[in-house]
Each structure stands twice: as C-alpha cells, then as structure tokens.
C-alpha cells in the first residue's frame, strides 16, 4: 500500500511538472514506421536546431500525416536515415508531430545529431511565412523540453543554416527565430 501511494504521488508530481507540455501526435497515430535503429543522446542537450521541409505546407492532421509518411519514407529509403530526420515536426495546422522523439538522436547533420533536438516545420519558409500557430507550437515545445530536462536551461537555438550549407529554415522562419529565447548565430 505504501509503495502504491509513493508511486501515485510521483505520478501526480510528474503530471504537474509536465502539465505545460503541448499535445504531441504520436508517430503511430500519423502512420509512421518504427525506427530501424535508435541512436541515444546524452541529456540534457545543448542545442535546439530548427529546419523546414522546404516543400508544401499542410492544413490539417490528415494532410500533415500524409506528408509525414512521405517524408519518413524518403528519409529512410533514399537518404538511409534510421528514422524521419527530425525529433519533432510542426505542421501547418499548428500541431506537433512525433518524429524520432525524445529518446533518439535525429538524423540531420553529422557532428550535431547527438547533441541537439531538431524541430522541423512543414513548409517552405524561404517563400512563405510560418503561421502564428506554428510559431507558438515551436516555443511551447522548446519550453516543454526544458521542463522535461531534455535540453539545458541555457540551450542555444540555431537555424539549420547556421551549422551547414542550406537555406533551411528559410528566410522568414529564420527571421522569426532571431527573437526567440536562446537564439544565437555563433553556436
């Protein structure tokens, strides 16, 4: 009985600690495959990297799920990644979708995968502006990661273009990131 009460109290405390975390649509729900292999990371991570998919956006869960299945297939079958390349992906609908998740290193930039959390935004933000819903979801996800101990309190936030040759996350999203907590051009 005592062990049950202790477990119950711990569960309640964890629920309160993570109460600020947004809803994350599971990989299973959007139709994703399981990872071929999980490369673990050492927590807390120092970096949060933001990229974009540089393709069309999506407007609802059905549309975003279809795009994620396509992206995951491309990443796993053509780029030989273990999973979809991002830890989490934010759709044009403002919802957060599980990618590789909290426990696995993403597949995006050699030398950075095991020390960063990669958040992707579905869409092309070189030509389009991200929605306010997407931007808020990104900020909430980062706050959640801090609360969970997944990233350091004094994390560094970078656009993918800061660490490799790419236009990602697009000029409009990159411009927005510059006002976010932790943003740096010099990781």
From Swiss-Prot:
Chief localisation class: secreted
Cellular component GO terms held in the UniProt record: extracellular region
Listed GO biological process terms: innate immune response; peptidoglycan catabolic process
Subcellular location: Secreted
CDD domains in alphabetical order: PGRP
Disulfide bonds: 21-144, 58-64
Pfam families in the cross-refs: Amidase_2
InterPro entries in the record: Amidase/PGRP_sf, Amidase_domain, Peptidoglycan_recognition, PGRP, PGRP_domain_met/bac
Domain N-acetylmuramoyl-L-alanine amidase: start-end pairs: 43-170
Carbohydrate-modified residues: 51
Glycoprotein in keyword set: yes
The entry's keywords: Disulfide bond, Glycoprotein, Immunity, Innate immunity, Secreted, Signal
Residues spanning the signal sequence: 1-19
Gene Ontology MF term list: N-acetylmuramoyl-L-alanine amidase activity; peptidoglycan binding; zinc ion binding
Role noted for this protein: Peptidoglycan-recognition protein probably involved in innate immunity by binding to peptidoglycans (PGN) of bacteria and activating the prophenoloxidase (proPO) cascade immune response. Binds to 1,3-beta-D-glucan and PGN.
Family that this chain belongs to: Belongs to the N-acetylmuramoyl-L-alanine amidase 2 family.
Protein name (database record): Peptidoglycan-recognition protein 3
Organism: Holotrichia diomphalia
């Amino acid at each position: 009985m005592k062990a049950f009460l202790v477990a119950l109290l711990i569960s309640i405390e964890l629920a309160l600690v993570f109460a600020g975390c947004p809803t994350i649509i599971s990989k299973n729900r959007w139709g994703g495959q399981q990872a071929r292999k999980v490369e673990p990371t050492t927590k807390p991570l120092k970096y949060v990297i933001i990229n974009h998919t540089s393709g069309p956006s999506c407007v609802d869960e059905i549309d975003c799920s279809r795009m994620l299945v396509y992206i995951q297939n491309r990443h796993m079958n053509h780029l030989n990644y273990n999973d979809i390349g991002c830890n989490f992906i934010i759709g044009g609908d403002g919802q957060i979708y599980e990618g590789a998740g909290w426990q696995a290193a993403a597949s995006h930039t050699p030398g950075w995968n095991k020390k960063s959390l990669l958040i992707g935004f579905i869409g092309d933000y070189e030509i389009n502006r991200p929605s306010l819903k997407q931007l808020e979801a990104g900020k909430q996800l980062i706050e959640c990661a801090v609360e969970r101990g997944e990233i350091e309190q004094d994390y560094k936030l970078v656009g993918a273009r800061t660490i490799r040759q790419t236009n990602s996350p697009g000029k409009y999203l990159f411009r927005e990131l510059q006002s976010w907590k932790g943003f740096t051009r010099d990781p």
